[in-house]
A protein has these predicted regions:
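Transmembrane alpha-helices
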Residues: 27, 79, 84-98, 109-140
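Glycine-rich helix-loop "coupling/hinge" segments at transmembrane-helix boundaries
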Residues: 42, 142-168, 204
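Membrane-embedded alpha-helices of multi-pass transport/permease systems
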Residues: 1-6, 21, 34-38, 47, ...
Length: 204
């Protein structure tokens, strides 16, 4: 939802602005993943930056519960993995032949119709690649649910960890591991299918 509009906007701006935005997107990769998660803990806690700012401005009387809930889990997951969606999409959109859009405009197609019939289908491989890069690590994610999500917000990676190391429940852990593998095989097969079709199309 967020990755496509951002990638599309980056691909349409001037090159100097584009390079600056890409640098900002890549900047978090130069710092520790764990440090970035801990930074969000400081921002969202009851004494963190958001609550302090809202209380100082008189918007709220007491601190909001922004931490250890589904909101904080989704927010930090999106922050952590959004670049993995943006970069493949940006690369695919940058390769788009804009003469196709000009031709569609000359033939009377509106910008929305040109986007839906040309830009969106031609960026399908980038969407699939980005979805793969996000989905695979998210399935096994343990750090963010453990540090940010709290005990009530479970993900497969956290369930697997608890079954193995906390409960010593090897049958349950093995079953969860098999489910995780099956969840990963399907999108990998889909991505391989579309990638093979694109390679064949380029050769043709």
């Amino acid at each position: 939802i967020f990755g496509y509009p951002i990638a599309y906007a980056i691909s349409r701006v001037r090159e100097d602005i584009r390079n600056g935005v890409l640098l900002l997107i890549m900047l978090p990769f130069w710092t520790s993943f764990l440090l970035r998660v801990y930074a969000w803990m400081g921002i969202l806690s009851t004494t963190g930056l958001v609550n302090t700012w809202l209380q100082n401005w008189g918007i709220i009387d007491g601190p909001l519960e922004l931490f250890y809930n589904q909101f904080s889990l989704i927010l930090v997951m999106v922050y952590a993995y959004l670049p993995f969606m943006i970069l493949p999409l940006y690369t695919q959109l940058l390769k788009l032949d804009h003469r196709l859009l000009e031709a569609a405009g000359d033939l009377g197609a509106s910008p929305i119709k040109s986007f839906l019939t040309i830009t969106l289908p031609l960026s399908k491989v980038g969407m699939i690649a980005g979805s793969m890069l996000v989905f695979i690590p998210c399935v096994g994610e343990y750090v963010i649910p453990e540090l940010v999500g709290g005990p009530e917000n479970l993900m497969i990676g956290k369930v697997l960890w608890q079954a193995f190391f906390d409960q010593n429940n090897w049958p349950l852990a093995s079953a969860v591991a098999v489910i995780m593998v099956l969840l990963l095989v399907v999108p990998i097969a889909i991505f391989h299918h579309y990638e093979s079709r694109e390679i064949e199309g380029e050769k043709a």
